[in-house]
């Protein structure tokens, strides 16, 4: 009787530990996935913001695809809607 109670209790403790470890791994996976997505997103933003919003003057031009308008002192996207 004592042996069966000991084995039952040991089995329940082992089951609890395995379930806890499994949930812990499942919780880490979304965190790792989100951190890798945001890391890639921040790398993209660094490349995109290379010229957009940089201060400019008429002597120092902007990158290709950007213009330095007369009204503002920073580089903006060139487009057909701009005069």
Swiss-Prot record:
<comment type="function">
    <text>Agglutinates erythrocytes.</text>
</comment>
<keyword id="KW-0732">Signal</keyword>
<protein>
    <recommendedName>
        <fullName>U5-theraphotoxin-Hs1d</fullName>
    </recommendedName>
</protein>
<keyword id="KW-0800">Toxin</keyword>
<dbReference type="GO" id="GO:0008200">
    <property type="term" value="F:ion channel inhibitor activity"/>
</dbReference>
<dbReference type="InterPro" id="IPR013140">
    <property type="entry name" value="Huwentoxin_CS1"/>
</dbReference>
<comment type="similarity">
    <text>Belongs to the neurotoxin 10 (Hwtx-1) family. 51 (Hntx-8) subfamily. Hntx-8 sub-subfamily.</text>
</comment>
<dbReference type="InterPro" id="IPR011696">
    <property type="entry name" value="Huwentoxin-1"/>
</dbReference>
<feature type="disulfide bond">
    <location>
        <begin position="56"/>
        <end position="68"/>
    </location>
</feature>
<keyword id="KW-0960">Knottin</keyword>
<feature type="disulfide bond">
    <location>
        <begin position="62"/>
        <end position="75"/>
    </location>
</feature>
<dbReference type="GO" id="GO:0030246">
    <property type="term" value="F:carbohydrate binding"/>
</dbReference>
<keyword id="KW-0964">Secreted</keyword>
<dbReference type="GO" id="GO:0090729">
    <property type="term" value="F:toxin activity"/>
</dbReference>
<feature type="signal peptide">
    <location>
        <begin position="1"/>
        <end position="21"/>
    </location>
</feature>
<dbReference type="GO" id="GO:0005576">
    <property type="term" value="C:extracellular region"/>
</dbReference>
<dbReference type="Pfam" id="PF07740">
    <property type="entry name" value="Toxin_12"/>
</dbReference>
<keyword id="KW-0165">Cleavage on pair of basic residues</keyword>
<feature type="propeptide">
    <location>
        <begin position="22"/>
        <end position="49"/>
    </location>
</feature>
<keyword id="KW-0430">Lectin</keyword>
<feature type="disulfide bond">
    <location>
        <begin position="51"/>
        <end position="63"/>
    </location>
</feature>
<keyword id="KW-1015">Disulfide bond</keyword>
